[in-house]
Amino acid sequence: MDLRSTLLVIGGSACSFKLLNTIVRVLPTPVLARKKAWKWRNVSTSLAHSSLTGAWAVLCFYFHPQMVEDLISSHSVLSHSLVAVSTGYFIHDFLDMAFNQSFKQSWELLLHHSVVISCFGLAVTTRLYLGFAVVSLLVEINSVFLHARQLLLLSGQRNRPGTEVTAPRPSVTYIITSWLNLGTFLVFRVSTLGWMVRWLAGHSEHIPRYILMMGTAGLSLISVMNTVLFYRLLRADILTDTHNTSKNH
């Protein structure tokens, strides 16, 4: 794609995710989630993005396997389109949070999105490092379960009916989602991030200094955020449940 087509795809993607967010607004919302209607819409839209781009990233490597060997210049129309569509989503989500949530609540994600938009924007406009960007989007496979978990919490479906007050017990759906979330977190966030750091370090001599600095800063930020996120998930879904089980016995 040329630059004009790329910008059109990014703009069209941002508008499409905004439209999807609006459609979710008019769809039935679970009673408990109505107290946080904006959050429900935002997470639902994020789930759609994760489902789409996670599968899309896998297909990019399936149909263009040589991209694994050359993450700098090797790419296809499929991979270029994927990164452009994802850039549009992150622009939409950045604006959605900026206008609907306080800075104190959203500054971490706003910072994350700023880094992603900068890196993806560079990749789609120069048509370089698209393979590296597609690797980073494999993380979205984990995000599917992360967002599904959030929706279960927002809709009050974490615990089994009738156990919420006396002895809270997680529902089967929540338990499965939680374990899939933790498992894919280790595979598609931790392992992928480690591989990206290793690749960046191994190819530092072939990468311009400003891009190397951008990549290093971005991966450092995401590493810290992932560490904090994993601790929060463990504390909420494993440590708390273990403590409650011991207490009940």
Task: Give short role names for the model-derived ranges.
Residues 1-139, 143-146, 156-249:
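Membrane-helix and juxtamembrane interface regions of eukaryotic multi-pass membrane proteins
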Residues 151:
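Conserved beta3-strand ATP-binding lysine motif
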